[in-house]
Amino acid sequence: MAETPIVYSTEGAAGKPVVVVHGGAGRRRHPFTPEREQQAAADIKRALDAAMAVLDAGGSALDAVVAGVHVMEDAPEFNAGRGAALTSEGRAEMDSCVMTGDGRCGAVAGADCVRNPIDAARAVMEKTPHVLMVEPTEAQCEAWGVETAPQPYFILPERERQLAELQALPDGGWDKPGHGTIGVVARDAAGNIAAGTSTGGVTNQQPGRVGDSPIAGAGTYANQQTLAVSCTGTGERFIQESAGYQLHARVLWAGQTPSDAAKAVLEAVEERGGDGGLICIPVEGEAVVAHNACAQMDWGYAFGDVRVTHN
């Protein structure tokens, strides 16, 4: 029988601007060295500081989320942006989504030329009539004012080594999903909430595979009636469970607390053979971090002068 998911919550953040960051959850095939663990924790703190700087200046939850995601996408320790996992063809195909509590949403999938995929996701939300766009081109990014980067920028030696190891296995399997995917959720001084998620997918995935991260209601969701959430883990299972929306629905209609709802969602994911975690911030109340007991998760939160990181 599966163990009960592990849940943490902030203490003292209720009613205050707050940010929560995750650096992915799952079963690591390639454990971090102590040095990389330290660097990952430092990067999470930098992301928290960047997001809180926005909130402390009176900025919006959306701007805070994008600022935090930027830091994580630029950090090679995480499977997003610069550190993206590689497909079976040795290319980076990245997915990202951003959503605000009023229902606005933008996402990209299969992005292969966007330096910071979260910027392209925001551009889809703010500069097009669409919600999800696949393989945004350099011309589109230029029109949106979004910075591009060539494939070599994303292809790191460590990721090439991981791909080669997997392809040398008898079954040519793919990596354990989830680890390194990044997400940020925030609540600003006005009580507005937002969520953003960014990922490079899964090492050795087939070209064109899309996980839960860019799917509103699966890996990313925000609703001003309840909460903002970013998920990480076995993407296919989070999609099947409509994890982000399910969390919202359990709080809104079943009357569950965010903590209890998070446990129930992750139990449902595990029943399908998946694992992972999530971070969420309610419109009111304490922020929540949760992950399956079998999964490892990197995360942190910040409010006021408080900074907490865990990995």
PLM regions and their residue ranges:
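Alpha/propeptide regions of enzymes that mature by internal proteolysis
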Residues: 2-311
